[in-house]
Every structure is written in structure tokens, then in C-alpha cells.
């Protein structure tokens, strides 16, 4: 069976503990910590068929369900310049970003970027790749199913300078997003009752009916 050990502080000794969100044979993974180091964020399938997100109090081991997931596994995480985990992404259909607290600094940054470009997390994938140590500047990418994306530098203006966003480079500039087809998620119930998820893509040229090519894969589970 899996055994867990915990240090409640940097100077504390390791202690053997039991986590109430773990069942024998289940899946559990440490994702990261909040900025203060008082909460650990854990993915566990204790109550759901795919891992959901829980916070664990580092002193009391009290657990709180932060996000219940029933469809897709975790596809990524978002951390700040100070190493704090503030977001987790899932892709049940489109990419979905789940913020781990209402006062998340990551959430404020992402809302700024969504508003600036007039997009949301349903059709556009915004990913922060790096920060400066003071958190004032960050590099992010903006992409979608039709656009390979571009790299930008965001100066947040925390040092008194004027906030700005500048283009750094474009990925695969030879591709014209206007000529790319949209990926549309769909799902249906199979004869055995299992819900199957997929995407369909229709050509941007020609006339219907088009020939069908089926590519089978294992997502999003």
C-alpha cells in the first residue's frame, strides 16, 4: 500500500500520516502548494472516476474539495513567479482553466489577457511560460485550434512603468489561420452506455458531403 510522509515546516521532522482522500489502489498526486506554504494541492480519484482537486491543510491535514472533475484528467498546471500553484487545466472539450482560489493572482492576470485580446478559454489557449523574479514581466503564448500561436511579453507595470504587451515571435508563420478548419467537440452515448468524446473537423473548401477520415485515440480520459 502507499505510505505518506509529511513535514509540517522546513525544520520539522518527517511524520507518517494518513490522508482521508486516498483509497487503496487509487490515484493520488501532489500538484503543488499555495504561496504561503500552508496548503498542498492534491489530485485524487477518491470520490470521482478521474482525479479531482483537493486542498490539504499542512498542519491539520483537513481536506477541502476545490474542483470536482468527472470527465477529463488534468492536462496542465499554472504556477506564479513565486512557485505558488494557482491554476489547473482540464480538456473535457475545450481547454478549461480552474483557478484554485477566488483571490488568485493568476486569475487576475488571465482575465486581463482575455479582455485585452477579446477571447476566452473556450476557443483560445493562453499559456504563461515564464515570469521575471519580481513578477512584473511574463512571457505567454496565445493559440487556438486554427492558429499555431504567437509569443508575447507582458509588462504588468508593477514597477511604475506603463503596462504593455509586445509581440515576440509567431509560430509557424507560413500557416494562415483563416484557412484552417475549426475543431468542434462532440460526445455521444455508445450502446454499452459509455459516453464517448471526440472532435470533428469540416473542410473550409469544397462542397458537402465530404469523405470521412476517423482517427481513434484515447482522450480525454
Spans of features found by a protein language model:
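Conserved beta-propeller blade repeats
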Residues: 1-4, 13-43, 51-53, 71-88, ...
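Short loop/turn segments that connect beta-strands within beta-propeller blades
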Residues: 8-10, 57-61, 157-159
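Non-catalytic accessory segments flanking enzyme active sites
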Residues: 97-205
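Short beta-strand element of the alpha/beta-hydrolase
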Residues: 208-218
